[in-house]
Amino acid sequence: MDFKWLHTFVTAAKYENFRKTAETLFLSQPTVTVHIKQLEKEISCKLFERKGRQIQLTDEGRAYLPYALRLLDDYENSMAELHRVRQGYSQTLQLAVSPLIADTVLPSVMKRYTAMNTETEMAVTIFESAEIASLIKAGEADIGLSCLKVQSSSLSCHCLYKDPVVLVAPPDKRFIEDNEIDAKEVLEQYLLLTHNHPDYWDDLLRQVRMTFPFVRTMKVTQTHITKRFIKEGLGVSFLPLSTVKRELAEKQMIRIPYQSVQLPYAGAYAIALYENKKEKKFLDFLSHFHF
């Protein structure tokens, strides 16, 4: 059996139209018809019947469809596995990673680890920190890298590093030239961009408002968008230092001293359900990595 026939069949079953099937698969309509006829001959049953310009599955076609989908899925998985083996991989490590960690420390971690462990295929999927623990519990990822600490009897949670939170602002000449920058003046002039980190904002914002009740805020839930807004002069924010190191070095932002309260630290955590050989190896690597 030619798997092209199966692919044509399931696509035709989806659209119930040979013309649309041909366009989707970049085939001619006669080729679609030939594929269906060949499959019908192979399995000795009629899969479609015509209703005017449309087609619809016969009872036999409807019964065969889930098996065709399963055959295609098995075929694609087998080809992916062969491709993985050809590349020299003997195992796969699935990571669920928060956007903030993926955008800061993950590239250097991945570069070092993959160079040292060429037999391990790495798969990285980005999720919000609040989702990661449940994904690990469900077995949808081997290790999670999250900005939220997890307290669970079924999960291990390792602190990777603590990142100081700093107040950053656009590179306004007045603030650059002023040796005694006043956080009060900055917060009076700019919007405070909040909730770009899943952990510290509720407590921090409450403390800021106790000292500066006049502060105007805008909720921006992604760190990279917050940084873009700051560089465009839209506002200021409290961000983990690692996320703005480059911008501070390139003078795209300036750091504002903030002494009204003790600013928090933002944590990064590795979460795992099992610590088998491949998970333990990666966790050991993280524990010795210089963040």
Swiss-Prot record:
One Gene Ontology term of the molecular function aspect: DNA-binding transcription factor activity
Gene Ontology biological process terms, A to Z: regulation of DNA-templated transcription
InterPro entries: LysR_subst-bd, Tscrpt_reg_HTH_LysR, WH-like_DNA-bd_sf, WH_DNA-bd_sf
GO cellular component: cytoplasm
Cellular compartment(s): Cytoplasm
Domain HTH lysR-type, residue spans: 1-58
DNA-binding region: 18-37
Pfam entry (one): LysR_substrate
Gene3D superfamilies to which the protein is assigned, alphabetical: Periplasmic binding protein-like II (3.40.190.10), Winged helix-like DNA-binding domain superfamily/Winged helix DNA-binding domain (1.10.10.10)
CDD domains, alphabetized: PBP2_LTTR_substrate (cd05466)
Entry keyword set: Cytoplasm, DNA-binding, Repressor, Transcription, Transcription regulation
Classification via PANTHER family: HTH-TYPE TRANSCRIPTIONAL REGULATOR (PTHR30126), HTH-TYPE TRANSCRIPTIONAL REGULATOR CITR (PTHR30126:SF64)
Primary role: Negative regulatory protein for the citA gene for citrate synthase I.
Family named by the database record: Belongs to the LysR transcriptional regulatory family.
Name of the protein described by the UniProt record: HTH-type transcriptional regulator CitR
Organism, scientific name: Bacillus subtilis (strain 168)
Gene transcribed to yield this protein: citR
